[in-house]
Amino acid sequence: MSRGLELLIAQTILQGFDAQYGRFLEVTSGAQQRFEQADWHAVQQAMKSRIHLYDHHVGLVVEQLRCITDGKSTDAAFLLRVKEHYTRLLPDYPRFEIAESFFNSVYCRLFDHRSLTPERLFIFSSQPERRFRTIPRPLAKDFFPDHGWEPLLTRILSDLPLRLPWQNKSRDIHYIIAHLTETFGAEALHRSHLQVANELFYRNKAAWLVGKLLTPAGTLPFLLPIHRTDEGELFVDTCLTTTAEASIVFGFARSYFMVYAPLPAALVEWLREILPGKTTAELYMAIGCQKHAKTESYREYLLYLANSDEQFIEAPGIRGMVMLVFTLPGFDRVFKIIKDRFAPQKEMSAAHVRACYQLVKEHDRVGRMADTQEFENFVLEKRRIAPALMTLLRQEAPEKIIDLGDQIVIRHLYIERRMVPLNIWLEQVEGQQLRDAIEEYGNAIRQLAAANIFPGDMLFKNFGVTRHGRVVFYDYDEICYMTEVNFRDIPQARYPEDELASEPWYSVSPGDVFPEEFRHWLCADPRIGPLFEEMHADLFRADYWRALQTRIREGHVEDVYAYRRKQRFCFRFAA
């Protein structure tokens, strides 16, 4: 093939990425209108649509390339020259880092995830030195309290692009100042100033003002979630100023933000200062660039692997009936493989499990479901695999493994944030920590249900505890929509011996769920049962679940808060 064809292919891939990111920005730019019009169902649809855009445009480019090459075979040297031409197109390209990931995706689609080497792919960036480049235009604006904090905040809120009236702007400003004064003191506040991102961050039913509070002691987050009333008036719900609070807002268990970012790398660098605990992958994930986040996540994994001599081991916790889970002892992620054969009580297929994981990817995760990254043909060095894990892999997933001598290839796996399994956490804590964990677990169930998600298997082992103490669901094989479940009361026993029988005295159909039965396994531990009955007894009533179903069917979309109820201004300051 000619050298001109190699350049044409490189240009076609980059043009395809341009088209994809253009549509990405187009969908994102509609977030303001959806918020102003309270079109919450459109918010959910836009979230799904934006996720699908990437794979759709990869497919379009692949079809173009097949037409261009007209079915001719391509040797290794040809492919290397295509990558070389593509690399030459990137030095002046503003979104070079995501363009590299797009190239990887096109290659993987064309060659069915085979021969994934650094020579053929951008396993590592071709331009790592550009990460801290000069930003062409300011991402944020500085505001100084020369005339006090009230006029400063008035100016910030008045400059917002939102076209709705405020419910009571002066009240909200008073609340913000009260929070800042209480937290930092008047003297420190007088010597501080704000830097506020030019673009709002939209998610669910809120528009987030994201900024930095620059104090004499250092830089802190400054986050204002702006909501609208049913009457279409704006109000600030709270003010968050700690890195822990910001980390939860930008957490891995939440849906991606809609924020207009023509230069995503620049935005990621700007955010890094107020989210010091977040990796590059997590920051890209938070702003919706999930495919590039996958690239960065893989790079973080390779870096960890290169700087440790740890072996892969089975992950701590109760062994799953559907998934085989392993990890590196010091790494903050786990690797999950769908087993070849499931336990008898798991009547489902591998395709069903994959569909459940995709549902979670596209759905509003409300801070209660862990995001995952999906990989194919994942290579592991045998010397890094503990013998016990290797035996387990060969027993539980032989069809998923290709033996290459010194390496194995895992045909398909998921990577997910590592957490402490809730059942293990509950064994280790007591007192207030135990109470907090049970409260968190019940709240997780409620928030998932309100978002039209029924976990299916609600055992403690299927939930994890994050480093911030939040309880997050991570076992998705029985997940379904709330509206697909038939919540029933257990019929009254006909005779006393009915309750002693091994089989139920009533009929049970597929999709039937009896919430009264939850009590048997959620309250079995005498330390936990009384706490659960105190805080979450309504979860054992079928009418509670049916009432939620009614609200969902009527089109109601619940409010989701990335902070505790007591932090809301309406509870904290209202008389």
Swiss-Prot record:
EC nos: 2.7.11.5, 3.1.3.-
Record-level Gene Ontology MF annotations: [isocitrate dehydrogenase (NADP+)] kinase activity; AMP binding; ATP binding; phosphoprotein phosphatase activity; protein serine/threonine kinase activity
Gene Ontology cellular component annotations, sorted alphabetically: cytoplasm
Organism this protein belongs to: Citrobacter koseri (strain ATCC BAA-895 / CDC 4225-83 / SGSC4696)
Record function comment: Bifunctional enzyme which can phosphorylate or dephosphorylate isocitrate dehydrogenase (IDH) on a specific serine residue. This is a regulatory mechanism which enables bacteria to bypass the Krebs cycle via the glyoxylate shunt in response to the source of carbon. When bacteria are grown on glucose, IDH is fully active and unphosphorylated, but when grown on acetate or ethanol, the activity of IDH declines drastically concomitant with its phosphorylation.
Protein localization: Cytoplasm
GO biological process, one term: glyoxylate cycle
UniProt keyword Transmembrane helix present: no
Main location: cytoplasm
Family stated for the protein in its record: Belongs to the AceK family.
Listed name of the protein: Isocitrate dehydrogenase kinase/phosphatase
Active site: 371
Keyword annotations of the record: ATP-binding, Cytoplasm, Glyoxylate bypass, Hydrolase, Kinase, Nucleotide-binding, Protein phosphatase, Serine/threonine-protein kinase, Transferase, Tricarboxylic acid cycle
Binding sites annotated in the UniProt record for ATP: 315-321, 336
Claim: Cytoplasm is one of the keywords in the record: yes
Catalysed transformations (reactions): L-seryl-[isocitrate dehydrogenase] + ATP = O-phospho-L-seryl-[isocitrate dehydrogenase] + ADP + H(+)
